[in-house]
Regions:
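Non-catalytic accessory regions of SAM-dependent methyltransferases
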Residues: 1-123
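C-terminal catalytic and target-recognition region of SAM-dependent MTase-like enzymes
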Residues: 304, 331, 345-407
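Conserved SAM-binding motif I beta-strand of class I
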Residues: 256-261
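Non-catalytic substrate-recognition/targeting regions of SAM-dependent transferases
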Residues: 109-120, 140-215
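Conserved class I S-adenosyl-L-methionine
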Residues: 232-241
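Conserved SAM-binding loop of SAM-dependent methyltransferases across substrates and taxa
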Residues: 228, 242-255
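Mobile active-site "lid"/loop adjacent to the S-adenosyl-L-methionine
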Residues: 305-335
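S-adenosyl-L-methionine
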Residues: 265-309
């Protein structure tokens, strides 16, 4: 097939990275770019000697200069190409999610071959984030193809809402914004709330004002795993956000649940979710700084909780702040270990890619040593399979979740 795309030549180091399967070319890895390269459009990527490596989206305004789409020289980036990719992504979710297909991540960026595009499904609502220029220029086409695919499978989709209110867009030269997508058959007059069921628990998802796309689907099966230990336990659910871990534990028969968050708005949503499930009398809510609360409980050594869940926000979003993040993670885990009695249980996690599993495990080992306890590992888990991990793209591997008994 004759190729008419502009070319960029990259360094030997970048070529090795692409050959290993990583899809990004950084600005300082570009040796030469044709004058015909246009931001947001397809370019061919070659070695310094001209050997073809792949094709992807070019953006001179981004530190990620090229996001590789394909290493198949026969690919034509037409509607049929995108329709195939969408079909693969949807079929994969139908296979791995089964009955949970109604509420899952349908498209997970690079892991599905859509660099910079995320789409979550909450029943009849799709919520999208577009974080690359290449996807921005094609989003209407992709949304239409996704709708066609879902409708062909019998799924009812009422609306698509864009949550492009993220600073990452600025790194691509894109403005922030939100709003309903206008396409034939879609509504644009909804109130921004949808009720979903996950693990048997009902949640009110605020996809207009909630964090990220409105609800963290990646912890779906970790919540279920955590709930399996909860029967008869006195649970301290830290960083509860919309209350999901605590509600799963209450529904599983916990003796008591105290769910804590520093945000009163989050707790208002959590209380509403408890009421949706008839669990309002089974869960208490406390607006407090978790660091301060754990410090107080560790000093008291009262041992009133025998199960602590730590689901903090990402303490680091760059390699530059990893050291500070490790200190933060260690502080909350160390205090939790000191609060728990021997035989108590700890669920702990990190949602930062930069806090690698090796770093997280080392931090937990340090905390256990300082607390003079041993950790009996029950499970080591990760994000759900609707957030697939590509081994050659470490950025797709971000969520660590551990269940321990303190011995």
């Amino acid at each position: 097939m004759e190729r008419n795309y502009p070319k960029i030549q990259i360094t030997d180091k970048a070529a090795r990275s692409l050959r290993s399967g990583h899809p990004w070319v950084y600005a300082d890895e570009v040796l030469q770019a044709d004058a015909a390269c246009v931001d947001g459009q397809i370019v061919d990527v070659t070695t310094r000697s001209g050997h073809w490596l792949g094709a992807g989206f070019y953006n001179s305004a981004s530190k990620i200069r090229v996001r590789v789409l394909s290493r198949n020289a026969n690919d034509r980036f037409d509607e049929a190409f995108w329709a195939r990719r969408i079909r693969y992504a949807v079929d994969y979710r139908r296979t791995v999610m089964g009955q949970d297909f109604d509420n899952c991540r349908l498209i997970f960026g690079e892991a599905d071959g859509f660099p910079g595009l995320t789409v979550d499904r909450f029943g009849p609502i799709l919520v999208a984030q577009v974080l690359s220029l290449g996807m921005e220029l094609r989003k209407q086409q992709l949304f239409a193809l996704l709708l066609q695919t879902l409708h062909a499978d019998g799924a009812q989709i009422d609306a698509i809402y864009e949550r492009n209110d993220v600073k990452l867009r600025q790194k691509e030269g894109l403005e922030q914004g939100t709003g309903f997508v206008t396409l034939d058959g879609l509504r644009t007059d909804l109130n921004g709330h949808v009720t979903i069921r996950e693990n048997g628990i009902l949640y009110d998802v605020d996809y207009i004002h909630g964090q990220k796309t409105g609800f963290f689907l990646d912890q779906k099966y970790n919540r279920r795993a955590a709930a399996q230990l909860a029967q008869g336990k006195h649970v301290l659910d830290c960083f509860t956000h919309t209350g999901a871990f605590g509600l799963n534990c209450a529904a599983a028969g916990a003796a008591s649940v105290l769910s804590v968050d520093v945000s009163e708005d989050a707790l208002t949503t959590a209380r509403h979710n408890a009421a949706l499930n008839g669990l309002q009398d089974r869960v208490e809510y406390l607006c407090a700084d978790v660091f301060d609360l754990l410090t107080k409980l560790a000093e008291q050594k009262r041992g009133e909780y025998d199960y602590i869940i730590l689901d903090p926000p990402a303490f680091t979003k760059s390699s530059a702040t990893v050291a500070n993040a490790i200190r933060g993670y260690k502080e909350i885990n160390l205090k939790a270990m000191r609060i728990l009695p021997r035989g108590g249980y700890l669920a702990t996690c990190s949602c930062s890619h930069f806090m690698t599993d090796d770093r997280f495990r080392a931090m937990l080992a340090d905390a256990a040593r300082d607390a003079q306890v041993s950790l009996r590992q029950i499970e080591a888990r990760q994000q759900g399979p609707d957030h697939p991990i590509l081994w050659n793209v470490p950025e797709t591997d971000y969520l660590k979740f551990y269940l321990f008994q303190i011995v």
